[in-house]
Curated annotation (Swiss-Prot):
UniProt protein name: Pyruvate synthase subunit PorA
Gene Ontology molecular function, alphabetical: pyruvate synthase activity
Root EC class: oxidoreductase
InterPro entries, alphabetized: PFOR_II, Pyruvate:ferred/Flavod_OxRd, Pyruvate_synthase_PorA, Pyrv_Fd/Flavodoxin_OxRdtase_N, THDP-binding, Transketo_C/PFOR_II
EC number, as in UniProt: 1.2.7.1
Source organism, top-level taxon: Archaea
Subunit-level organization: Heterotetramer of one alpha, one beta, one delta and one gamma chain.
Catalytic activity as recorded in UniProt: 2 oxidized [2Fe-2S]-[ferredoxin] + pyruvate + CoA = 2 reduced [2Fe-2S]-[ferredoxin] + acetyl-CoA + CO2 + H(+)
Membrane-crossing residue ranges in chain numbering: none
A Pfam family the protein falls into: POR_N
Length: 396
């Protein structure tokens, strides 16, 4: 029988790793994700998890050790955040290019400078082009579930790409919620044994991995990574369906909330989706025709789902805890690209919110709604990017 425990998202991530039975875990502690490797090391030390826990001197070494272990043919796991993920950047491309299905948990945290240990999505968003799949959890239960799903998709022979699962720093990593821990036997049925056919060590059949590619072959190598990410879209849907059948919890690439008759649909990710849904309920009671959409899978980007969502709205409003310096928020930019060739599309407006752990309040969402309502009334967007909750007196 599944058991329910009250735990932080960090603990939920550690439990997910335990349930997945990786053979090698390599990690270096960093706020706010430190508890993840701590808890896993306890599982290993207590004999609850049969695995090699590698203590390393940096995040660069942690991901490098995982690459080596995955290349040897075993299931691997790591965890990090913020500057730690940034330090891994070089090796993230290598993991994807070598088609190694490593799974990594991320306590989403702002990047320096200035130093900030609180939440936004900039760390993972900055890695969106590395070839890693990206999942974002709204709550602690999703942190556990999405790690299991990430393994299922990553290890599928149609995909064979690494995956990261993000959950908001402190808002989730250090906040306790009830979490259902599934039966080990059911997880074993869901994931199965990892038996790679492309990456392994066999003295009788030596192979070279990650070798030099001349111009005559490099482009084809990059294409296969892109193609695998495209195939992952279908595999993710299949994994979601199987997960629901076995565990009773439903996931979608984009989860909609009260969008059926909405004129304005707000789009976001992570724990902010919970706040947004509460606010939507309040606005509905006040007579506003608003809805919400939560992106669970950011890479591969849910192009078709965004197009279907756009058909329901007159205005798509994006709430983003990230900023692409020199353009807009990343989700807004990607959604704009997804809709560029559509003959009919809604007005689109982007809101930058909550950077560095700043609270996103109902009053701020009201401000965003006012701007979106103005665009709806006038039939045009005055400013595509809007900073909400900014202390303007400090920047002028």
């Amino acid at each position: 029988m599944p058991i329910r425990k009250v735990m932080k998202a960090n603990e939920a991530a550690a439990w997910a790793a335990k349930l997945a039975k990786p053979k090698v875990i390599a990690a270096f502690p960093i706020t706010p994700s430190t508890l993840i490797p701590e808890k896993i090391s306890e599982f290993v030390a207590n004999g609850e998890l049969d695995a090699e826990f590698i203590k390393v001197e940096s995040e660069h070494s942690a991901i490098s050790a995982c690459v080596g272990a995955a290349a040897a043919g075993v299931r691997t796991f790591t965890a990090t955040a913020s500057q730690g993920l940034a330090l891994m950047h070089e090796i993230l491309f290598i993991a994807a290019g070598m088609r190694l299905p490593i799974v990594m948990a991320i306590g989403n945290r702002a990047l320096s400078a200035p130093i900030n240990i609180w939440n936004d999505w900039q760390d993972t968003i900055s890695q969106r082009d590395t070839g890693w799949m990206q999942f974002y959890a709204e709550n602690n239960q999703e942190a556990l579930d999405l790690i299991l799903i990430a393994y299922k998709v990553a290890e599928d022979e149609r995909v064979l790409l690494p995956a990261m699962v993000g959950f908001d720093a402190f808002i989730l990593t250090h906040t306790v919620e009830p979490v259902e821990i599934p039966d080990q036997e059911v997880v074993d049925e869901f994931l199965g044994e990892y038996e790679p056919k492309h990456a392994y060590i066999d003295p009788a059949r030596p192979i070279t991995q990650g070798s030099l590619a001349f111009p005559a072959h490099y482009m084809e190598s990059r294409y296969t990574v892109w193609e695998a990410m495209e195939r992952a879209k279908k595999v993710i849907d299949e994994a979601f369906a199987e997960f629901e059948k076995k565990f009773g919890r439903k996931y979608q690439k984009i989860e909609e909330y009260k969008t059926e008759d909405a004129d304005i649909i707000f789009v976001t990710m992570g724990s902010l989706a919970g706040t947004l849904k509460e606010w939507i309920d309040k606005k509905r009671e006040e007579g506003y025709k608003v809805g919400a959409a939560k992106i669970t899978v950011y890479r591969p980007f849910p192009v078709e789902e965004i197009r279907e969502l756009a058909k329901k709205a007159k205005v798509l409003a994006f709430l983003e805890k990230n900023i692409t310096i020199g353009l807009y928020g990343a989700v807004f930019t990607d959604a704009s690209a997804a809709l560029i060739n559509e003959s009919e599309k809604p007005l689109m407006v982007d809101f930058i919110v909550g950077l560095g752990g700043r609270d996103v309040t109902f009053n701020q969402l009201d401000e965003a709604l006012e701007i979106a309502e103005k665009a709806l009334k006038e039939g045009k967007v005055e400013n595509p990017i809007n900073w909400i909750g900014l202390r303007w007196e400090l920047v002028k």
